[in-house]
């Protein structure tokens, strides 16, 4: 719906001028009150760069908004961070791969007579 369309560069201004909290932003974006429309770039034609946006309010609450599958997806952002592609939820899952990292050597683990040493 072009009547709800904003360029990727205009989207942050719309957020800042229309809403007072991340809850208001969430409701508007999830209801489809806005869509990101392609911008014509010389030599590229109409494109909508997959910008990712971070939104904070005065309470410290934060959201990430990113294009996924042609729609804007909203994520709660407890870490207060922003990522590029792949999607924010992928990065949150990937972060769990590093939770158990430790700067100290891990002692070998013995299981049924076999000893397993940590890599690295």
Go through the PLM ranges and name each one:
Residues 46, 52-58:
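Short, structured surface segments that line ligand/substrate-binding pockets
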Residues 1-14, 56-120:
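C-terminal, well-structured catalytic/ligand-binding subdomain of enzymes
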Residues 1-2, 36-39:
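A contiguous strand-loop segment
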Residues 40-46:
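Short, glycine/acidic-rich hinge or "gate" loops at secondary-structure transitions
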Residues 8-33:
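Alpha/propeptide regions of enzymes that mature by internal proteolysis
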